Amino acid sequence: MSTDPKDSAAALEDTIARYNEAWNAHDLDAIIAMHAPDMVFANHTAGESASGAEVRAHIGSIFETWPDIAFSTRRLYVRDGLVVQEWTATATHANEMRRGDLVAEPTGKTISWNGLDVIPFEDGSVKRKDVYSDSVSILRQLGLL
């Protein structure tokens, strides 16, 4: 567990609020600035992982597929060095979506789904982001299941 004051639970409450604001603003520069250089972004639901410089392109592809995506935090758990948050996303499927071998053409449907992030911090920066979301709900709402 980190002993850096920037990783204290009190500091991380402010940090995660700014991080979530950057995601909702689709501000890639602000998001990336809050990541450690060797940060890992793992979307376990989609079976995708990116690290280092790949993370910008990966997050950019999320904003491209879902250009109006917005997240609301349902529950937030913060302790020294770690944030776990449950969220609901609402977005319009405006561009191609890839999930492994599945390629879904844009449907124009606006849908909502739930997810959970596990975010360890190091030196005040996001060290990794493990994302778990309800892909069955996404695929059903898009008419793909």
Whereabouts are the PLM-identified features?
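A short gly/proline-enriched turn/hairpin at secondary-structure junctions
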Residues: 3, 34, 39-50, 62-66
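Short, aromatic-enriched amphipathic alpha-helices that serve as compact interaction elements
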Residues: 8-26, 34
